[in-house]
UniProtKB/Swiss-Prot annotation:
CDD domains on file: UBCc_UBE2D
Function recorded in the entry: Catalyzes the covalent attachment of ubiquitin to other proteins.
Single annotated GO MF: ubiquitin conjugating enzyme activity
Pfam families named in the record: UQ_con
Disulfide bonds: none
Record key words, sorted: ATP-binding, Nucleotide-binding, Transferase, Ubl conjugation pathway
This protein's record includes keyword Nucleotide-binding: yes
Name of the protein this chain belongs to: Ubiquitin-conjugating enzyme E2-16 kDa
Species in which this protein is naturally found: Pyricularia oryzae (strain 70-15 / ATCC MYA-4617 / FGSC 8958)
Pathway: Protein modification; protein ubiquitination
Chain's gene name: UBC1
């Protein structure tokens, strides 16, 4: 079941790739993908290329994939291990969702962080109280790690 669904998503991604994102298997292992997200132009991540690892569980799509950033990023919802705090990767997962939709949600989170459900409270605090400082640090990290 999982393999059939993963293959279908791979075909769909090739046919209709989401803008500014790409994803595909690492080598022959269809359960382990690498994805790239281009930093959205209307965000402090503009110009950056961010890599993510995607691991599909054997009971996919009934359980969500594990997705994490392998490129360092300064963001209130992404920690230093690359873990992502995003509801659709946890309790709001639905088998109707696809990797394409997950990547688009992550892209939108880069533009609009959710400081009220942070994985890194310190960054969320800076985001809420000193937005210019947050954007400056995020741009600096993008230059340092994603370009």
């Amino acid at each position: 079941m999982a393999l059939k669904r993963i293959n279908k998503e791979l075909t769909d991604l090739g046919r209709d790739p989401p803008s500014s994102c790409s994803a595909g298997p690492v080598g022959e292992d269809l359960f382990h993908w690498q994805a790239t997200i281009m930093g959205p132009s209307d965000s402090p991540y503009a110009g950056g290329v961010f890599f993510l690892a995607i691991h599909f569980p054997t009971d996919y799509p009934f359980k969500p994939p594990k997705v994490n950033f392998t490129t360092r990023i300064y963001h209130p919802n992404i920690n230093s291990n690359g873990s992502i705090c995003l509801d659709i990767l946890r309790d709001q997962w639905s088998p109707a969702l696809t990797i394409s939709k997950v990547l688009l949600s992550i892209c939108s989170m880069l533009t609009d962080p959710n400081p009220d459900d942070p994985l890194v409270p310190e960054i969320a605090h800076v985001y809420k109280t000193a937005r210019a400082q947050y954007e400056s640090t995020a741009r600096e990290w993008t230059r340092k790690y994603a370009i």
